[in-house]
Amino acid sequence: MRTIPPAVAVFLVLAGYASTPAAWGHRPIQAAENSQYRLVENWVHFPPEVTKWGQATGVDVDSHDNVFVFHRNELMPIMAFDTHGNFIRAWGRGMFKTTHFLRVDRSDAIWVTDRGYMEAFKFNREGTLLLTLGKQDVLGDNTSHDTFNGMADLAVTKNGDIFVADGEGPNTRVAKFAKDGAFIKWWGGKGTEPGQFNMPHSIAVDSRDRIYVADRSNNRVQMFDKDGKFLNQWTNVGVPWGLFIKGDLMYLVDGSDNNCLLVMSLKDGRILDKVTGLSNPTAVAVDSTGAIYVGEVNGTNVRKFIKTKS
């Protein structure tokens, strides 16, 4: 069993994996101009042990607007900060191989995915390990019940069901598990038809437990019900790397040539706002005030944006 070092105070940013630029593709985006959001400079206060971000692949917020980041730093890969950027704690030293996404569920449990070891981990806010999905360095296929080969991201529904985007690798599926980690089903397979995937890289769930999948190399977001039935797709999203849903809005980052953040209507997929000039954005999260946090890989940064006008 893996031993976790004691938690160390720090803000948590979730960092993500970047493939080669040639593989990212380019899909121009038509979007709203004159963004309502502005960058907040120097928003975070680092502890002495870590003075800058590593590649930031995962970020999310809890019910108290504390920010958690998963980034590529051996000493403090998971860091937590309060809404003012003050360091709280950190944990995970020596535990991960290739940090990827981070999610906070409705109970404020912290989930992270490791694309290297092909595992996902659930922690409480103090850093105690509660659950593991997958087996370290054991690779599965699309039909596997307890192993992965493309562990990318996950989402948790209101009843605790876990949906894993197992797609950054040979696998091309969404796998569904019960809250205790018991396998339920999978769907997908490689292809371009509705319900098929070509790198399902990120996954999110809305208030009605509908599942949204960033089908990255197919340049679309697909929507499903909780049983995997295809509902709809959006193709106006560029190359979707990371998704986050809050209320009736979807926040999507395109980490390829567009290097942007999109704010979209969940009702019809319309683009309402666009933030450009990012550097390989991979993860995005939004707090209760509407502040947006974006984790960048090439930029090795976690950027904070606030709304300046309605």
Tell where the protein language model's regions lie, with residue ranges:
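Positively charged n-region of N-terminal signal peptides that target proteins for export
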Residues: 1-5
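Bacterial N-terminal signal peptides
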Residues: 7-17
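Eukaryotic scaffold repeat domains enriched in small/polar residues
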Residues: 19-310
